[in-house]
Amino acid sequence: MNDAPLPRGRHHQQGPVINATTSTAPHQPAPAAPDTAIRPALRALSLGAGVQSSALLCLSADGTLPKIDIAVFADTGWEPKKVYEHLDRLEREIAAPAGIPIVRVSSGNIRNDALDPNHRFASMPLYILNQDGKQGMTRRQCTGEYKIKPIKKKIREILGYPYPSRVPKGVFVEQWVGISTDEFHRAKDSGVQYMHNAHPLIDIGWSRADCIRYLERLGLADTPKSSCLGCPFHGNAQWRSIRDASPSEWADVVEFDAAIRQGNARANATGNPLLGQAYLHRSRVPLSEAPIDHVTAAEWAALRQETGAPDAEDLETGVVDGCSPWACRGEQPEPVRDDFGLAV
């Protein structure tokens, strides 16, 4: 769908701050103190179309939270069909009636870029089996390139200071990020002065479970996790869901998994080949052969020892909250390198 018209930067109006000091003149009210607080030019939502960010959009649309001026969805070009369908529904049924524009931004197609020898590729966190049999991972750069970068670019444009213009001090956007109380430790700032991250779900004391119940009441119980179709942080349950519910998408990820076995095309073309083999699944076997079906407790124990999974729940559920630009749950559990060579 086409991007809705963008709001120009403006300051939100709030009531004056009243000086509560007792007046020295009898029967005279204390004068209002000057309102010198620096306010955001506008409020924006980092919309991943997962549970928490969807809940924030709905809470703003129904008036429970202040109205946001814009929601920005960073499209990696390889989101599951369920995410695109859910995003369309949010725009049609929630955002548009409330007058909240949803803008879609992109830095390219992460799948195509990985297989294009002429394109710089920001690496995905692939599971590596080194030539000496040791295990490792490639460094996660995809969130910065395909999520954070296009959002920052759009915010600069909205403020009227596109790169490389300098954004004046004091000009900033209040950016809402979908972090709930059960993951408050993930809350962090944006790293740039023109975007101040806010976490309204923490402010109102909502957990992920609260968000799910709220979305269920709105008829949005099928809100998906927000992550790339072929995200290596998927758990077995997510891989099974793709395989069983969407054969075409399963064929897509199986094909991609095989295509990146020797590393990304750009690295190979420039003489920096992967010194090992890359896989999408933690087991470090081809995705078409990976043990993604439910197994017994004894099998869990054996598989956990074999794959190095910290626990069976992680292997099954994967990244619980999907991929958020400023709060990716994909912490590096194993040694990495910046390049796409040997993971040590």
Each model region followed by its residue ranges:
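Nucleotide-activated chemistry modules centered on ATP-dependent adenylation/adenylyltransferase
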Residues: 2-344
